[in-house]
């Protein structure tokens, strides 16, 4: 009887350990690699606003800035973007939660469960994902598109986004041409797409 009890408790502990590790892991199996704000050279936010989680919306943007093809260039674009958003537009930080670089990497903007400045009226209810470049007349690379899709799956698995989320283009929530005509047509085929917030 003692051996059976010890075995039961040991197996229970192993089960809970594996379940906890599975629920808290973040890495290539669960999320795409995310280049942290510190790693791309970003400044700290002036103020941080938090969102409740899980959120129910993802808003897709394009930056209409020059593209980038490697981590050094994309990091430079991120620094320039953050400086413009803070110094010229008066935002507290870079406006997006995450940004997809031309190198197929995800760059941290304000990050998880923090309020961006990407979609007035919807910032506290959505994750803003921007693609570096102008996607009016061409699509982002397959690597960029896959990185964004992987990030959305990651958000769901981490509990940052509901499974029944709505995916919108920036033009669906404000007066803009973002995320560009070609990219907007593309995201209409993605899971969760809707024109109504």
UniProtKB/Swiss-Prot annotation:
An individual GO BP term: peptidoglycan catabolic process
Tissues where the protein occurs: Localizes to plasma (at protein level).
SUPFAM superfamilies associated with the record: N-acetylmuramoyl-L-alanine amidase-like
Annotated Gene Ontology cellular component terms: extracellular region
SMART domains: Ami_2, PGRP
The UniProt record lists the keyword Disulfide bond: yes
UniProt entry tagged with the keyword Hydrolase: no
Signal peptide stretch: 1-23
Main location: secreted
Subcellular location: Secreted
GO molecular function: N-acetylmuramoyl-L-alanine amidase activity; peptidoglycan binding; zinc ion binding
Domain N-acetylmuramoyl-L-alanine amidase: from-to ranges: 53-180
Disulfide bonds: 31-154, 68-74
Keywords from the named record: Disulfide bond, Immunity, Innate immunity, Secreted, Signal
PANTHER family assigned: PEPTIDOGLYCAN RECOGNITION PROTEIN (PTHR11022), PEPTIDOGLYCAN-RECOGNITION PROTEIN SA (PTHR11022:SF74)
Family: Belongs to the N-acetylmuramoyl-L-alanine amidase 2 family.
Function: Peptidoglycan-recognition protein probably involved in innate immunity by binding to peptidoglycans (PGN) of bacteria and activating the prophenoloxidase (proPO) cascade immune response. Binds to 1,3-beta-D-glucan and PGN.
Protein name in UniProt: Peptidoglycan-recognition protein 1
Native species: Holotrichia diomphalia
Annotated gene: PGRP-1
């Amino acid at each position: 009887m003692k051996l059976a009890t010890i075995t039961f408790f040991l197996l229970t502990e192993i089960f809970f350990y594996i379940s906890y590790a599975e629920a808290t892991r973040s890495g290539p199996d669960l999320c795409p690699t995310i280049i942290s704000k510190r790693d791309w050279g970003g400044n700290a936010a002036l103020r941080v606003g938090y969102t409740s989680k899980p959120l129910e919306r993802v808003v897709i943007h394009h930056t209409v800035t020059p593209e980038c093809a490697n981590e050094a260039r994309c990091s430079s674009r991120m620094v320039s973007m953050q400086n413009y958003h803070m110094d010229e537009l008066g935002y507290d930080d870079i406006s997006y939660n995450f940004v997809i670089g031309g190198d197929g990497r995800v760059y941290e903007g304000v990050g998880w469960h923090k309020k961006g400045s990407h979609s007035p009226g919807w910032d506290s209810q959505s994750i803003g994902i921007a693609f570096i470049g102008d996607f009016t007349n061409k699509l982002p690379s397959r690597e960029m598109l896959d990185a964004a899709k992987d990030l959305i799956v990651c958000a769901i698995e981490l509990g940052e986004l509901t499974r029944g989320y709505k995916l919108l283009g920036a033009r669906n929530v404000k007066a803009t041409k973002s995320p560009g005509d070609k990219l907007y047509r593309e995201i209409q085929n993605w899971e969760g797409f809707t024109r109504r917030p």
